Amino acid sequence: MIFKAVRVPFKSGRFAVILNEEDASELGVREGDRVRVRYGKAGVVATVQITREIVEKGFVGLTDLASMELGISDGAEVDVFPSPKPKSVELIKKKTRGEKLSQDEIRRIVEDITNNALSEVELTAFVISSMLRGMDFDEIEWLTRSMIETGERIEFDRGTVVDKHSIGGVPGNKISLLIVPTVAAAGLLIPKTASRAITSASGTADTMEVLANVNLSVDEIKEITERVGGVIAWGGATNIAPADDKIIRVEHPLSIDPRPQLLASVMAKKGSVGAKHVVIDIPVGEGAKIEKVEVGRSLANDFIELGRRLGLNVMAAITYGGQPVGRAIGPALEAREALKTMEDRRGPSSLVEKSLGIAGILFEMTGIATNGYQHARKIFESGKTLEKFREIVAAQGGDESVKAEDVAVGDKTYTLTSQVEGAVVSVNNKSIVKIARTAGAPKDKGAGVYVHKKRGEVVKVGDPLLTIYAEKEWKLDNAIEVANTERPIVVSGMVLEVYGRRGV
């Protein structure tokens, strides 16, 4: 059937069309069915949504993504007709039955994910079946290779390419802002593609964006990395492993991160940027994504094995994840803390030691130094880390002369103080993140939390425990309410209990 196209005013990460219910009935399609939309030589397969009022009879509503793909404007005539389900739907059913998929079958599923041929329900079924039925290492390897092959790739013309990745789960993990320039200052290439926050208060890309442009193309990532040694860019601005972003989109509402997808997601991105040596940061501790050391070790071994199959030299670091890294949580606060640490050549031990430790592992993996940690510390303390970071900021369109004091943070603040004397016995990662997000992070770059006291530190009555920063008064009020409810930092007296009789 021929329809007049009209763009509908909402964005969708998938191809979708909106049909009047009478037209849908005549086409013989129902809500959630597929149709092919053809405009000249261009075409897309889209999911049907049905309405009585939004779109008139004889018109078809197209989401922004579908409109851009077809290259059409309002009023253009398009041909719409039913489209069968892709073959990968049957392959997903096969996995739900617990059967092993072949390399070609996994490739077909990934291609359909990349091309937006699967509905949200079908993609979710694939993710859930992989979690419940599992994947063996052959399947995980094939999934990873398919993710790499269906996206953009970077091939560098010179140098040794390295990379690092943290599996997340710990607030304030701004270590990439120190690791990348430290490693680049040693002559290695480190094209760090980072993520934005999904459930955290700030992803590495959110933090770096305070100081420089992170929306870089693959060509820009290559050019800058070869020129100055490294970048910190948002992976979502590229077409690197595009299936991964679509998988993450359905995992997020369910708060799941199945191991097969986690392994494939990380290693596909590392393989796509040409990395030959990779360090995986696996934070372990109370309130982290992984709370038990043995689970962290198991995951580390899986990363190493998958790397071996892909021809990548992989090492994993089990790191402490029981409380935030550094003291600042939130994009601008973290950028300021990272900058000040580089300027002063000292800072929170959790931030400095973790950053130099992981940079040192990369130095030892590549033969740069036999004692990688000491080599990384020498670079950091010499000021070369800051010098290289400023080069990277300038190459990404930022102000090369920016100082920590120049970074603006939220001007609406509230400080939570201790009501008792004693020592901090716990810092709740999840509560800290909840407060920071309620205050507006990461969308409001200046919002977040600064932790004054961490586990083991002595506290007096009235001492500040944490300060909340916000850009809007009402968000600060909401964050204060959360802070007073959650007990993000717990202080206990040094005497916990008293036994026995008092007096005579």
Curated annotation (Swiss-Prot):
GO terms for molecular function: 1,4-alpha-oligoglucan phosphorylase activity; AMP binding; pentosyltransferase activity. The active site is at D257. AMP binds at G169, S195, R196, A197, I198, T199, S200, T204, S265, K289. InterPro entries: AMP_phosphorylase, Asp_de-COase-like_dom_sf, Glycosyl_Trfase_fam3, Glycosyl_Trfase_fam3_N_dom, Glycosyl_Trfase_fam3_N_dom_sf, Nuc_phospho_transferase, PYNP-like_C_sf, PYNP_C. Keywords: Glycosyltransferase, Transferase. It is an enzyme of class 2 (transferase). One of its GO terms (cellular component) is cytosol. Its EC number is 2.4.2.57. SUPFAM superfamilies: ADC-like (SSF50692), Nucleoside phosphorylase/phosphoribosyltransferase catalytic domain (SSF52418), Nucleoside phosphorylase/phosphoribosyltransferase N-terminal domain (SSF47648), Pyrimidine nucleoside phosphorylase C-terminal domain (SSF54680). It catalyses: AMP + phosphate = alpha-D-ribose 1,5-bisphosphate + adenine; CMP + phosphate = cytosine + alpha-D-ribose 1,5-bisphosphate; UMP + phosphate = alpha-D-ribose 1,5-bisphosphate + uracil. PROSITE patterns: THYMID_PHOSPHORYLASE. GO terms for biological process: AMP catabolic process; pyrimidine deoxyribonucleoside metabolic process; pyrimidine nucleobase metabolic process. Catalyzes the conversion of AMP and phosphate to adenine and ribose 1,5-bisphosphate (R15P). Exhibits phosphorylase activity toward CMP and UMP in addition to AMP. Functions in an archaeal AMP degradation pathway, together with R15P isomerase and RubisCO. Belongs to the thymidine/pyrimidine-nucleoside phosphorylase family. Type 2 subfamily. This is AMP phosphorylase 1. It comes from Archaeoglobus fulgidus (strain ATCC 49558 / DSM 4304 / JCM 9628 / NBRC 100126 / VC-16). The lineage of its organism: Archaea, Methanobacteriati, Methanobacteriota, Archaeoglobi, Archaeoglobales.
